Amino acid sequence: MDKVAAVVAAAGRGSRMGTETRKQYLSLAGLPVVGHVLRAMEASSAVKSVVTVVAPGEENYFRLTVVERLGIRKVAAIVPGGEERQDSVYNGLLALAPDTGIVVVHDGARPLLSPGDINAVVQAAAAYGAATLAVPVKDTVKMAGRDGFVLRTLSREHLWLVQTPQAFRYDIIMNAHRQARQKKYAATDDAGLVELLGRPVKIVAGSYENIKITTPEDLTVAEAVIKARQGRLAEAGG
């Protein structure tokens, strides 16, 4: 398989957490949130190197408090982010080695991914060019107008909630970001930029546990998930 590298986007402000500390540095089961992400990348058999994108000026802080503290060996570069997430990911892409074949993009505030998740999207990207982890919608979804009244109910049959990691052939994701910068358009995720090129993106079924830390309640849920996982491991070992 082509050389696989990851870009971890960890430059977000996290204003909805209501804390001065950026959410990716908050403690989760004894580790920074983003530390769980890097440990999963470290355990992935597919990923060979990681570029982490952090808030400008926090590069050394990140290296000391996360990378060196946790003994992470795959981090090849720590680069400053841009004004928006899309800009930050682009900065990370620019820092990748030129012989990169497949790129994994992941949110630094999504700590519950597994090495298996990473490997699965990498395999799909190698086969199809682009892939994203996602889960089927469970709840009823309604479209509402600006007045707050329901316009219609959407069928759940073909609806998926998109997550990260997402993975792409290097040339595809670089072209998608360059086209976006040139034409000044934006998407809420990297797969969306690839879709705008008219390229197919393969869905890889993920886990409902793979939540993004956005509010204080999410931290509580994530703690519970980690404890449940530890309990299952203890039972399997005992």
UniProtKB/Swiss-Prot annotation:
UniProtKB keywords: Isoprene biosynthesis, Nucleotidyltransferase, Transferase
Class of the enzyme per the UniProt entry, highest EC level: transferase
Keyword Endoplasmic reticulum: no
Family matches, as SUPFAM superfamilies: Nucleotide-diphospho-sugar transferases
PROSITE patterns hit by this protein: ISPD
Organism: Pelotomaculum thermopropionicum (strain DSM 13744 / JCM 10971 / SI)
The organism's taxonomic lineage, starting at the top: Bacteria, Bacillati, Bacillota, Clostridia, Eubacteriales
Site entry (Transition state stabilizer), positions: 16, 23
Domain of life (superkingdom): Bacteria
Family affiliation: Belongs to the IspD/TarI cytidylyltransferase family. IspD subfamily.
Documented EC number(s): 2.7.7.60
Molecular function GO terms recorded: 2-C-methyl-D-erythritol 4-phosphate cytidylyltransferase activity
Catalytic activity: 2-C-methyl-D-erythritol 4-phosphate + CTP + H(+) = 4-CDP-2-C-methyl-D-erythritol + diphosphate
Positions of the record's site feature: Positions MEP for the nucleophilic attack: 156, 212
Name recorded for this polypeptide: 2-C-methyl-D-erythritol 4-phosphate cytidylyltransferase
Listed Gene3D superfamilies: Spore Coat Polysaccharide Biosynthesis Protein SpsA, Chain A
Keyword 4Fe-4S set for record: no
Function comment: Catalyzes the formation of 4-diphosphocytidyl-2-C-methyl-D-erythritol from CTP and 2-C-methyl-D-erythritol 4-phosphate (MEP).
PANTHER family per record: 2-C-METHYL-D-ERYTHRITOL 4-PHOSPHATE CYTIDYLYLTRANSFERASE, CHLOROPLASTIC
Pathway: Isoprenoid biosynthesis; isopentenyl diphosphate biosynthesis via DXP pathway; isopentenyl diphosphate from 1-deoxy-D-xylulose 5-phosphate: step 2/6
One GO term (biological process): isopentenyl diphosphate biosynthetic process, methylerythritol 4-phosphate pathway
Signal peptide residue numbers: none
